[in-house]
């Protein structure tokens, strides 16, 4: 290999052996933490930058400005360092100090937004700041992971190919910008239309419909629905709260040796919902990132206590999984009009 960028992708799939997986069924985990910055956003960032360079929207040696909750900023910063680009990442107080230092290690400039929008979220405030910075840096490029069609297009054309090597009934992922799950789903369904797709989101997010309310998880959810969230790509949906997602993270770390981020815990729980509440025999779940980003939050008991997070044990999770009916979204129907699985 001639560049760190060539190490992006080809992440492993492991079968989860845990008592929470129903007997006779299989849960496979696609571990995107094996990308160089430990998240699926390495793929997204690479796809957006390559497309921009090809189209001329980004000049060699130019400037990239993007809003990020954590992972995409790391990916863009690394790519900028490798390709000689200036990178400015716009973040908010939910970002960890580790992530900020990560950006700076690659030479990126960090711009912090401290005031939330009227709904209590930071995404819109970050985007407004991006617009200001674009005026201050003429010729700069905004990848706009939320609405840029090159986001799902890259995952459709490239990432989805890695999901064709295994037989499974349902693909499970999470939504924020919607780009990776929409693109992967589209690529898979083109060749294997029988595969169903479950879109998971955090309770409080408005990405799949409904009103926004603040939540703790990073890297999942949005205060609105982005253009890259294509509802027609999804067959099922599930809304999962912070407590269940974080509990899943802690259990998988302690009992399976899997140190996962909050969005991955959310997806793992959603995948189990599918196995418990549907006829699916095998599920492939996309684990977006590593827990290394969250050692001082999700994996810190004092932080959880301060945030009033209740951790469920294995048996409590099993009872919830057995008690809840799994609902299917009708094809072509807006998910916000379909009752969701909420906890």
Which role fits each region the language model picked out?
Residues 1-343:
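PLP-dependent amino-acid enzyme catalytic core
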